[in-house]
Amino acid sequence: MVSKIMNKKYEKGLSLIESAMVLALAATVTAGVMFYYQSASDSNKSQNAISEVMSATSAINGLYIGQTSYSGLDSTILLNTSAIPDNYKDTTNKKITNPFGGELNVGPANNNTAFGYYLTLTRLDKAACVSLATLNLGTSAKGYGVNISSENNITSFGNSADQAAKSTAITPAEAATACKNTDSTNKVTYFMK
C-alpha cells in the first residue's frame, strides 16, 4: 500500500516536470516567433521606405520634366500627387511621413549646380539607416549622405558619407560607421541629378 502511494506521488511529480518542460518549450517558441516577427516587420518597413523614395523620385522627375530647375520643390507638391500613399501623407502638417515614424523631406539644391534635388529620410534607427544608406539609385543619383545637417547647401561630393555627401554608393561598412546614432535620429539623404 505504501508502495502505491509513493508511486502516485512520483507520477504527480513527473507530471509537473513535464508541464514545466512544455511551458519552457512554449516560451522558447514564442520568443523565437517574436524575434522573427520583429525582423520581418523591420524588413517590411525598409522595403516600404525604398518604395516611397522611388515613387517620390519618379513623381518629381515627371512633374519637373522640361523645367530648368527644381525651384519651389517641397513636400507640399508631392502631397498633391498620387505618388505618395495616403497613409504617409500628413496633410494637416503638410509633411510626408516615412514607415519609421520620421519624415521624407524633399527640396531643391540651394543656388548651386552640384545636384538637382534631394530626398531625406529622418528618424531612422541604426539598422534602418544602414539598410537605406546602402540603397544604390544608379545613374539618376548624384550622391548619397548620412546625417547631413544642411542638405540643400551641399556644393561638392567627396569620398565620405559620414555627415558629408559622397559621390558614389555607400558600402555596408561605410553605412555601419556613418549610422552611429542609436536613438533613432539618423538621416539618410539621396542627392539626385
From Swiss-Prot:
This is Major structural subunit of bundle-forming pilus. It comes from Escherichia coli O111:H-. Major repeating bundle-forming pilus (BFP) subunit. Is required for EPEC localized adherence. InterPro entries: Bundlin, N_methyl_site, Pilin-like. It is found in: Fimbrium; Membrane. It comes from the Bacteria. The chain crosses the membrane at residues 14-35. Gene3D superfamilies: TcpA-like pilin. The modification N-methylleucine is found at residue 14.
